[in-house]
């Protein structure tokens, strides 16, 4: 616990973050969630797509009971890859109420349609549909699905190659087909949309190319995302039977990249005997083998730009639907890219999501859960641990640095000794101080605490401030290595709550196991009444004053003594 803890520093290797990477469930009760979007209107709402054709709102941690949009009557979700797949809000949604969806129709076609919000801001007008684009296809799979507005204010659309396995129509390489592409259109131009003049094939003079195409050579890029800070585009493309890949397009790109499918699958020749030539193709910045990882379908995510986990800043997060693995990806400093494992989510990752604040989430497709991505402070204190919030709070406030540095551990079940408790108490009193608040005397006050002892200054400061009278009077001793009891903790933390000179009221006999004549009787009753420590048993009520106090309970008591969560 000695020293002021530093925030988690940007890792020398992103893998250094793996012990702290955390998924915390923030919503449940969804049915096959496949995507989400925020409206960018300052409401803080997250709009979640359920594959059958429903959009639900998560607001302030609660799912609203009434859907924002229900178009199940229009959506075909019979195939496992069909359904309502994409949602994007117009950049001026706060003033114009326009949003766009991507879904599959009964005839297997892909539909891009515009809707408007209704009079109730939490409900869309389901009858306001205006179909903008219909893309026919022959198979139920490989539909792409993501919609997003780029930093240029234009709408980007991902489409799969049309399915059937192996791209039988060679749509990925066919510039006369809108399948197997990223498209870019202007929804504020002509009706139903305009083709931006700057699109790479809009003005090439070739009647056999489609002007809507922004990038091609894709198999099933059903998840892509823009980096909200840089404008860079990240495209995760699901592989056939060998490789899963992540592609990168810099914000300054004029478009027109050919990402290789079906000439290539990742960096491999799709047909090994073809001796394919990768010249002119844009190779992935990350890829992984299905057979080597147990993966089957890459799920693209987001570059983290939130504020709650600064060490994740600038890292692209992505995962695999089947294996549940989540990776980070970032430049390696030498012109290449570094990808590293962060966690196994333990569920089918159907999508990632980004809220208005830049925080990132992952969806559990099977169980219908939504999990927020974050970094916990200690590798050995999971979000499910009973004192997780208290331990996180005192670390972030600078009261503790943990019991081990690499990886950072808190050791919540380790019993607190009286030397460590001196640091806890004085930081509770003074805040996140790095050194004892008083200069210790040259001659020790306590016979059992030498000037060379690591906690000498802390224990002397505890004495100077009147927090302790030691563990014995003749000779005066502190017992620094003695394990802390619940009774002793009651004294220390009550004095943080009140003042070092605090004395408790006379005891009234609350506890069956506390004799009224015991030195600590008034202290434990006062600690219980102040909410610093609960009873250890009821019927009859017991306090267990001689039980040892571990570091988790010390964190709990410190938080309560400082007024509870959140800490001031």
Residue ranges and their predicted role:
Residues 1-166, 223-226, 230-243, 294-336, ...:
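Acidic, Gly/Ser/Thr-rich repeat motifs that build Ca2+-stabilized beta-propeller blades
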Residues 2-22, 63, 121-125, 192-204, ...:
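Blade/loop signatures of beta-propeller domains
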Residues 19, 29-30, 80-81, 139-141, ...:
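Conserved loop/turn at the beginning of each blade in beta-propeller domains
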Residues 52, 109, 169-179, 243, ...:
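A detector of repeated loop/turn-to-beta-strand junctions in beta-rich toroidal repeat architectures
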Residues 112-120, 171-187, 249-250:
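Beta-propeller blade signature
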Residues 218, 336-356:
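Conserved blade-ending motifs and adjacent loop-strand segments that build the rim/top face
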Residues 376-388, 401-419, 426-458, 469-487, ...:
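Feature responds to low-complexity, polar/acidic, surface-exposed segments characteristic
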């Amino acid at each position: 616990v000695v020293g002021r803890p530093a925030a988690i520093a940007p890792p020398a290797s992103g893998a250094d973050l793996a012990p702290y990477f955390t998924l915390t469930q923030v919503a449940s009760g969804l049915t096959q969630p496949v995507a989400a979007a925020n409206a960018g209107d300052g409401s803080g709402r997250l709009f979640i797509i359920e594959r059958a054709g429903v959009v639900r709102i998560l607001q302030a941690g609660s799912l609203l009971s009434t859907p924002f949009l229900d178009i199940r009557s229009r959506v075909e979700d019979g195939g496992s890859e069909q359904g309502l797949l994409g949602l994007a809000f117009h950049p001026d949604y706060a003033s114009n109420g326009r949003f766009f969806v991507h879904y599959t129709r009964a005839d297997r076609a892909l539909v891009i349609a515009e809707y408007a919000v209704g009079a109730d801001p939490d409900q869309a007008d389901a009858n306001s549909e205006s179909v903008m684009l219909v893309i026919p296809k022959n198979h139920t799979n490989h539909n792409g699905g993501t919609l997003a507005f780029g930093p240029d204010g234009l709408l980007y659309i991902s489409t799969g190659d049309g399915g059937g396995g192996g791209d039988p129509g060679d749509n990925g390489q066919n510039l006369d087909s809108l399948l197997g592409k990223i498209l870019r259109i202007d929804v504020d131009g002509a009706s139903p949309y305009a083709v931006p003049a700057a699109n790479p094939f809009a003005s090439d003079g070739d009647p056999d190319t489609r002007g809507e195409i922004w990038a091609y050579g894709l198999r099933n890029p059903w998840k892509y995302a823009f980096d909200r800070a840089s404008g860079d585009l990240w495209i995760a493309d699901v592989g056939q039977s060998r490789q899963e890949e992540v592609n990168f397009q810099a914000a300054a790109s004029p478009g027109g990249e050919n990402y290789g499918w079906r000439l290539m699958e990742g960096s491999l020749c799709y047909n090994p005997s073809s001796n394919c030539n990768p010249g002119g193709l844009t190779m992935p910045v990350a890829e992984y083998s299905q057979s080597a990882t147990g993966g089957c379908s890459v799920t693209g995510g987001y570059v983290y730009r939130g504020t709650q986990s600064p060490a994740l800043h600038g890292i692209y997060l992505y995962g695999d639907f089947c294996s549940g693995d989540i990776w980070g990806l970032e430049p390696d400093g030498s012109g290449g890219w570094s990808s590293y494992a962060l966690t196994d989510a333990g569920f089918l990752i159907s999508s990632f999501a980004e809220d208005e604040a830049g925080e990132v989430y992952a969806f559990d497709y099977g169980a219908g859960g939504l999990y927020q991505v974050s970094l916990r402070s200690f590798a050995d204190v999971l979000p499910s641990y009973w004192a997780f919030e208290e331990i996180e709070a005192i670390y972030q406030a600078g009261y503790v640095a943990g019991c081990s540095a690499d990886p950072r551990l808190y050791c919540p079940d380790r019993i607190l000794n009286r030397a460590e408790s001196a640091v806890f108490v004085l930081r509770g009193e003074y805040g996140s101080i790095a050194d004892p608040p008083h200069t210790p005397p040259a001659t020790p006050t306590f016979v059992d605490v030498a000037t060379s002892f690591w906690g000498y200054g802390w224990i002397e400061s505890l004495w100077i401030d009147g927090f302790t009278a030691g563990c014995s009077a003749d000779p005066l001793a502190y017992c620094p290595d003695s394990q802390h009891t619940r009774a002793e903790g009651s004294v220390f933390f009550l004095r943080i709550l009140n003042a070092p000179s605090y004395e408790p009221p006379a005891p009234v006999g609350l506890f069956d196991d506390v004799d009224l004549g015991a030195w600590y009787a008034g202290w434990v009753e006062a600690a219980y009444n102040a909410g610093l420590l609960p009873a250890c048993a009821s019927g009859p009520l017991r306090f267990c004053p001689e039980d040892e106090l571990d570091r988790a309970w010390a964190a709990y008591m410190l938080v309560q003594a400082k007024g509870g969560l959140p800490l001031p």
